[in-house]
Amino acid sequence: MHCITRGALAYGRGERGWATVGRIICISNQKGGVGKTTTAINLAASLASAERRTLLVDMDPQGNAGSGLGIKQDNITGTIYEALLNDRPIQELLHPTELRYLQVVPATPDLTGAEVELVNQDNREFRLRDALRPLAAEYDYIIIDCPPSLGLLTLNALAAADSVLIPLQCEYYALEGLSQLTHTIDLVKQGLNPDLKMEGILLTMFDSRANIAHQVVEEVRGYFKKQVFEVIVPRNVRLSECPSFGKPIILYDIKSKGCESYLALGRELMKRDTPKSPRRRVA
């Protein structure tokens, strides 16, 4: 626990009390294997280690965000499915984690059926937004882990979010599907959520030995400019190991390169949120 305190101190706590309505950030990329869930877990853990009240909502039927934080299937008392389809208050679905300031709303494979079941629901694209509304003042950050698709579950996340963070692996097919995702974001802004913003693109799985990785970084930074986060997440063995132990990297190996990168991402994100920043109003 002492090492987490030191990690949190590295951020600097700044002014407390100004973030009365937390920001909702969804982590999305319809292409699988880009580090989406890894980013959701470890960004949430990094923010929590800085004593930011953080909620991680798992909208991926694979349920890896919950299991990656040590939530065992046998111990799950409620999932996001129940909030979306059964109108169960989301306050009843919160699960604690090893980090004091981090809670999670888990998912199970039952969520797969929600794509079909939501079709006939009233306000089907706004079910998550309405479920999260009572929690708006309880958290500094709500992180949503989206499924690797652009169906109704992802649309719910985009409609509920203030911004989208897109993980992008530093590999040959990195930009494949990115244009489709940005097009979907534009459509959501036109209809479901006019205030939705691009939080940024996070370059992941960077291998400094591979020329193609450097080329991807150059190409993405050249095209998206300031929309790309400064930090780059490297390929890291410890980062790939920690989910099997049910721990975020900050609890598994705080000295690893993977941990350093996600702590840096948390710092970079929090620098954008100053007391002068306009806060979202609760409708």
Swiss-Prot record:
Q: Indicate the impact reported for residue 32 to V.
A: Probably does not dimerize, no longer binds DNA in E.coli, still interacts with PadC in M.xanthus
Stored SUPFAM superfamilies: P-loop containing nucleoside triphosphate hydrolases
Q: Which InterPro entries match?
A: AAA_dom, DNA_Partitioning_ATPase, P-loop_NTPase
Question: Which GO terms of the molecular function aspect are on file?
Answer: ATP binding; DNA binding
- Keyword Membrane: yes or no? no
* UniProt KW Nucleotide-binding keyword: yes
GO process terms (BP): chromosome segregation
For this UniProt record, the keywords arranged alphabetically read as follows:
ATP-binding, Chromosome partition, Cytoplasm, DNA-binding, Nucleotide-binding
Q: Which domain of life is it from?
A: Bacteria
Outcome of swapping residue 209 to A: No DNA-binding alone, in presence of PadC binds DNA in E.coli, still interacts with PadC in M.xanthus
How is loss of this gene reflected in the phenotype of the organism? Essential, it cannot be deleted.
Task: Kindly report the protein's main subcellular placement as a broad class.
Answer: cytoplasm
Q: Name one GO cellular component term.
A: cytoplasm
Where it sits in the cell: the answer is:
Cytoplasm
Q: Which family does it belong to?
A: Belongs to the ParA family.
Subunit-structure text: Monomeric ParA interacts with PadC; PadC recruits ParA to the bactofilin scaffold. Probably cycles between a monomer and dimer; ATP-binding promotes homodimers which bind DNA, ATP hydrolysis causes dimer and DNA dissociation.
Please give the function described in this protein's UniProt entry. Answer: An essential component of the chromosome segregation machinery. The ParABS system segregates newly replicated chromosomes during bacterial cell division. After DNA replication the ParB-parS partition complexes interact with ParA ATPase, promoting the movement of the origin region towards opposite cell poles. Segregation may be driven by rachet-like mechanism where ParB follows a retracting polar gradient of nucleoid-associated ParA.
Name of the protein in its database record: Chromosome partitioning protein ParA
The organism is Myxococcus xanthus (strain DK1622)
Q: What is the lineage of its organism?
A: Bacteria, Pseudomonadati, Myxococcota, Myxococcia, Myxococcales
Q: Which gene encodes it?
A: parA
